[in-house]
Structures are given as C-alpha cells and as structure tokens.
Amino acid sequence: MVKMKVGRDPTADPSRVRAAREAIGAGVELFVDANGAYARKEALAQAEAFAALGVRWFEEPVSSDDLDGLRLLRDRAPPGMDIATGEYGYTPWTFRRMLEAGAVDVLQADATRCGGPTGFLRAAALCDAFQVPLSAHCAPQLHAHLCCAATRARHLEYFHDHVRIERMLFDGALPAERGLLRPDPSLPGLGVEPRWAEFERYEIRV
C-alpha cells in the first residue's frame, strides 16, 4: 500500500491522485491523508473523486476535532472507503469520544503522543470494546511490538523519515520483509540498542 498527502490544492488533488494510481498500478492499495485540510462538503466531493481512482483510505478528511464532520464523511463516503483519524489523540478520553461519536472506520493511535506503550494499549482496548480496527501511526520500530499485543491492529505506518532515523540511531532496527515487520521475542524491550555516538552528534548543551 502507498499513502500520499492531499489537501494543499484541492483543485489539483484528483489529478495528483490519478497520477499516483497510474504510477503504482491497480494492484496496490492507495491511501490519502488530508491532515484536516478540507471543509465537509469539499471532503465529500473529494471522497467521490478519490473512490473512482480506487482510494480505500481517507485520513483526516476534515479536522480531527470535527467529530460531526467525520461522522458525516463516514456515513456518506463511497462503499469500500475507510475514514481514519486519531494520530493527534493524546488521552484515552479523546479516543473514546471519537469512537462514541461513530467518527471513524479505523482509529489511529501514536504511542509517541498518547502516553507511550500504555497509552497505545489503552487505545487498543477501546478499539476492542467498540469493535473498530486500529492503525499505528509512524514510529514502526516502537509500534511493531505493540501491534503484536493489539488484537484489532490492522497495520502500522512505515514512514520513510522515521525508518531512516531509527536505523541511524539504533542497532537492531527491524527490516521490512515483504511488507512485514517481525519483532524478535528473544530480545528485551524494543529489541534495539542506542548508538550513543550518533545521539551525541545532535546533542545541544544548555
């Protein structure tokens, strides 16, 4: 699967998505992420255009704070298109509000924002309770282990910049193999060791 950003220029977005579809072919899932850039009616129109190009995932079509707007998109988006949000959730209460509002087809959570492994697993427990899939946002080395403990985890985001940083700063960062990350259960913690010399290169003394 491939995810691309949309929302900066709504008039150009359908043609950009079409170009991406032509580049990756019909056999690869295509996701789009608007980061809340669209208004409600604009997002609905874009959902129709994107669905015609085989887009299966529409992330933050409107602001993640607009739960009514997200519910509107979830109810009216074309069949087969998931509405996803949650990467800016910081507390279990935020995730619960989204789920109670019926605002998402897939809840996103990011352990670097929502209270670490414990916060992520609380979001996972809420997904269990509401029977909603969970997607991990970025930081694949961290989330690979957590997703193994989350029964409703659908996938995690393999974001190039995060992967590059993880490989630069840690020994033992997991390689992707045929779209999969396989944590080694014999290793403690997250299975990595810091490269302290690399950390020191970016140290700022105050």
Task: Locate the predicted segments by residue.
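Gly-rich Lys/Arg/Thr-decorated short loops/hinges at beta-loop-alpha junctions or inter-strand turns
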Residues: 1
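Catalytic core of soluble alpha/beta enzymes
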Residues: 4-137
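Flexible C-terminal active-site loop/helix
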Residues: 135-206
